[in-house]
Regions:
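Bacterial N-terminal signal peptides that target proteins for export
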Residues: 1-8
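Acidic, Gly/Ser/Thr-rich repeat motifs that build Ca2+-stabilized beta-propeller blades
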Residues: 28-173, 219, 223-230, 278-318, ...
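Bacterial Sec-dependent N-terminal signal peptides
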Residues: 9-36
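Beta-propeller blade signature
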Residues: 123-132, 179-191, 239-241
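Conserved blade-ending motifs and adjacent loop-strand segments that build the rim/top face
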Residues: 320-343
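Repeat-solenoid scaffold signature
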Residues: 206-236
Length: 365
């Protein structure tokens, strides 16, 4: 489960997906199981991250700067903190959120947000301490990441004692192939903000490069999976590997044009394990392995914005392919931004329409 490491590390986690060199035709069959949906929160304004906390609340961010907790049993929303420094510009603002894996003894909260720095739009990752119902003692872990009204990445995942951060190209295509730039990367830090000694380059926070706008990140089966927005083609699901190049902007999706094939060979490019053309705008990503909805066991769940659909990607027993893909909620709630999964197996999705956004609970009928 995304950003719920105290539960995630206990699960038998697996993932891999079907590789179709021509891309998906987006004509997947309808959902293979009947799902009931109910709204547990409404009147939100662009929620961006939702995650299940150890207090049985859904912790969530809203792009304008709010961090809150939702009790899904009652619908009660409790404000945690509004960060005045946050500047919401286009798709920028208050974005990713993660909780320390040992939250009961180390109540730390990690957030990503965009702000103005001497007239420049920038992004930072800050660690807070949760105490007395609010967040205190901010510590900046990494700063001066270029931000933009689009392509900010900003998903967080804590794996063991390391913090992974996805960054977009911030509309500057020169950055992803430059390993000394922080944009267009998956970054990896220690939880105190220092650079791990076993990163690909000493003193450099990058873990992988050549990314356009990865907005989904989940750890499963000792692998880190990402969902990444393509341009007008080739949204991607990737497996993130240490020090590897994922091709952007020289490669879009698979290495299947003459120019791409040469670049891929010369630069040892990692191809996506799934790609969609036309695009569906892949965003939040999570892993499902609960008995509540047995048809979804061993699946990746992907929230999509443009397609306004929740995708279930069923993984094979060998974890090297997708056996089938199912679609849920198509157009029912509009754009879907993120997903979280409760220990009970219930699934929650948040919308990204603005003004009257909702968090929706999914359960088996």
């Amino acid at each position: 489960m995304k950003n719920a490491s105290w539960l995630l590390l206990m699960l038998p986690l697996t993932a891999a997906v079907f590789c179709n060199k021509s891309g998906s035709n987006n004509n997947e069959p309808p959902g293979a199981v009947d799902i009931k949906d109910s709204v547990v929160a409404k009147n939100l304004n662009f929620p961006w991250e939702i995650l299940w906390g150890p207090d049985n609340n859904i912790w969530f961010t809203e792009r304008g700067g709010k961090i809150s907790r939702l009790d899904p049993a009652t619908g009660t929303i409790t404000p945690v903190l509004t960060i005045a420094e946050v500047v919401s510009n286009g798709e920028g603002g208050m974005l990713g959120l993660a909780l320390h894996p040992n939250f009961a003894t180390t109540p730390q909260v990690f957030v990503v947000y965009d702000y103005n720095n001497a007239g420049n739009y920038r992004e930072k990752v800050v660690r807070y301490t949760y105490a007395g119902g609010t967040l205190t003692s901010p510590v900046i872990l990494i700063d001066n990441i270029m931000a933009s009204g689009i392509h900010n990445g900003s998903r967080l995942a804590i794996v063991n004692d390391k913090l992974f951060i996805s960054t977009g190209d911030a509309s500057d295509q020169s950055l992803p192939q430059n390993i000394n730039a922080k944009n267009g990367k998956i970054l990896r830090l220690n939880l105190d903000g220092s650079v791990p000694a076993d990163n690909p380059v000493a003193g450099n926070p990058y873990w992988s490069f050549g990314h356009r706008n990865p907005q989904g990140l989940v750890f499963a089966n000792n692998k880190l999976y990402s969902a990444e927005h393509g341009p007008n083609n080739d949204d991607e699901i990737n497996i993130i590997e240490k020090g590897r190049n994922y091709g952007w902007p020289n490669v879009e999706g698979y290495c299947n044009t003459d120019g791409e094939k040469k670049f891929c060979t010369d630069n040892n490019i990692v191809e996506p394990i799934m790609a969609w053309t036309p695009t569906i705008a892949t965003s939040g990503l999570d892993y499902y392995n609960s008995d509540l909805i047995p048809q979804w066991k061993n699946s990746l769940l992907v929230a999509t914005l443009k397609d306004a659909t929740l995708y279930q990607l069923k993984l094979s027993d060998g974890n090297n392919s997708i056996t089938n893909t199912n679609r849920y909620l198509s157009g029912t709630y509009g754009r879907l931004r993120d997903i979280c999964i409760a220990p009970s197996g219930k699934v929650y999705v948040c919308t990204s329409n603005g003004g009257n956004d909702r968090i929706v609970e999914l359960n088996r009928k």
